[in-house]
């Protein structure tokens, strides 16, 4: 099913990209290959909800749990956009009339292992 969903989304993006490239320099630098949305990952969680807040909170907890188990997580915002644009993709995902794709979490074991986090400046926090 993952491959079928991705293939449908790729077809949609390939159809609309010529128009998007007219106004977006980022789109002009982007090529849409067959693995554009899910990057060949072994698992994808498509978060479906009636409202954005509930779905986003659920996705955030899923991300934390996946990372706690050593998985890497990528939010595929482009797949979310494709699902919102394509009635056929929504139908294929089995969405009800009041449901929508809030996000898609692409899961897999990271190909790299970081030795440390990126350096960050201390946050300026004031309590009142």
Predicted regions located by residue number:
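N-terminal start-of-chain detector that recognizes signal peptides
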Residues: 15-21, 73-80, 96-99
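Residue-level signal for pocket-adjacent positions within structured domains
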Residues: 33, 84, 90, 120-122
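Solvent-exposed alpha-helices and their adjacent loops that cap or buttress functional pockets
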Residues: 36-40, 93-98, 118-119
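Glycine/small-residue-rich phosphate/adenosyl-binding loop
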Residues: 1-53
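Small-aliphatic-rich amphipathic alpha-helix that forms the alpha element of a beta-alpha
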Residues: 43-92, 105
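Generic alpha-helical secondary structure signal
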Residues: 3, 7, 84-87, 99
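Glycine-rich, charged/polar anion/phosphate-binding loops
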Residues: 29-32, 89-92, 111
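C-terminal helix-cap and adjacent tail motif
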Residues: 100-128
């Amino acid at each position: 099913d993952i491959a079928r969903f991705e293939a449908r989304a790729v077809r949609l993006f390939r159809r609309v990209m010529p128009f998007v490239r007219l106004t977006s320099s980022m789109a002009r630098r982007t090529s849409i290959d067959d693995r554009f949305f899910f990057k060949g990952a072994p698992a994808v969680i498509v978060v479906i909800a009636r409202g954005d807040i509930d779905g986003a909170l659920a996705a955030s907890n899923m991300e934390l749990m996946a990372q706690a188990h050593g998985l890497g997580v990528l939010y595929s915002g482009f797949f979310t956009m494709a699902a919102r644009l394509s009635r056929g993709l929504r139908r294929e995902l089995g969405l009800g009339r009041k449901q929508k794709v809030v996000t898609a979490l692409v899961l897999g074991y990271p190909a790299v292992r970081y030795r440390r986090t990126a350096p960050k400046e201390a946050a300026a926090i004031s309590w009142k």
